[in-house]
Amino acid sequence: MDSKHNSPASYTYAQAGVSIETGNALVRAIAPLARATRRPGADADLGGFGGFFDLRAAGFADPLLVAANDGVGTKLKLAIESGRHDGVGIDLVAMCANDLIVQGAEPLFFLDYYATGKLDNDVATAVVASIAEGCKQAGCALIGGETAEMPGMYSDGDYDLAGFCVGAVERDRVLTSDKVAAGDVILGLASSGVHSNGFSLVRRLAADKGWKLDRPALFDQTVLLIDALMAPTRIYVKSLLPLVKTGKIHALAHITGGGLLENIPRVLPKTLHAHVDADSWEQPRLMAFLQAQGNIEPEEMARTFNCGIGMAVVVAEADVADVTAALEAVGETVFRIGHIAEGERGCTVTGSAETWSARADWSARHNA
């Protein structure tokens, strides 16, 4: 009897839903994208067991390393549903790199984690290309990452992203709350849109209100609603880093989850309070649209969305003009939005009647 007829079936990884060759093809496709992010200290070649970075080659003398990691939240679900994958990588880098600059740190290198049920190289390449673009905007090298193909873990077409960024700052240049003082001025840098927070509410509104995402936005007929919502998060690193090195910036707050109310207090000492005047900048039309569609109260706006301010910059009154001019010279839109005063650590946002669709003068407060 031929023994081969009695032998058990031979299983392969591919039969289980994982294609090693597809993964290898992806690495070959994205390697040039990573190499394009090279910077002093990193060669950004992929394929090894780990990535190297030379702090001395990057020009640091007595640095502290600063690390951050984040994701894109449920904005990713909207990207998957709409087939718009070419901006979420910028979002991913922005959420990490902007968190580093608020410590005074220069982003140095980035790693990503891409997980999916079945690898689609066209989608994955588009995502990694946008991560590489984000790294260029932040001035950091894409030195590695992980692509995980996990059958049964995700629905068809779904994927998840996580980013990890490491930066460095000279020991004597770390931004802490120690420099913030009563009388300091709060400048706001304009956001590029919703950024990457509040999308669970955005998606709920889209479903409940029956938005036609592929149609021109009601507030701007020149742009599709989906494009307005998916605008990548602005990366502020290159605009802020030179000013951080001058010592003129006392503190920075990245306006993410928790909005203005909860993020500004994170950079204040226990004895100081931030006062923000919502009348000092015009509410972006996209934010006004979201508020009107959801009948959202001003306080809820101030703790859910960035409301048009992606980064808060705290400076001394004497440096307001110089810092504003320097930021505007590199393309930032700058508003004087508030001040720091003595009081319990926290933030109060106030507005007059009609500001943010209010029916009367209003005030929203959060104590940290």
Curated annotation (Swiss-Prot):
Pathway given for this chain reads:
Purine metabolism; IMP biosynthesis via de novo pathway; 5-amino-1-(5-phospho-D-ribosyl)imidazole from N(2)-formyl-N(1)-(5-phospho-D-ribosyl)glycinamide: step 2/2
Q: What class of enzyme is it?
A: ligase
What Pfam families does the database record attribute to this sequence? AIRS, AIRS_C
One GO MF term: phosphoribosylformylglycinamidine cyclo-ligase activity
Name the chemical reaction catalysed here: 2-formamido-N(1)-(5-O-phospho-beta-D-ribosyl)acetamidine + ATP = 5-amino-1-(5-phospho-beta-D-ribosyl)imidazole + ADP + phosphate + H(+)
Recorded hits in CDD domains, A to Z, give: PurM (cd02196)
Instruction: Quote the cellular component terms of the Gene Ontology held in the record.
Output: cytosol
> What's in the keyword line of the UniProt record?
ATP-binding, Cytoplasm, Ligase, Nucleotide-binding, Purine biosynthesis
In short, the EC number is 6.3.3.1
User: What subcellular locations does the record give?
Assistant: Cytoplasm
Matching NCBIfam families, A to Z? purM
Q: Which family does it belong to?
A: Belongs to the AIR synthase family.
What is the protein's name according to its record? Phosphoribosylformylglycinamidine cyclo-ligase
Which gene is this protein's source?
purM
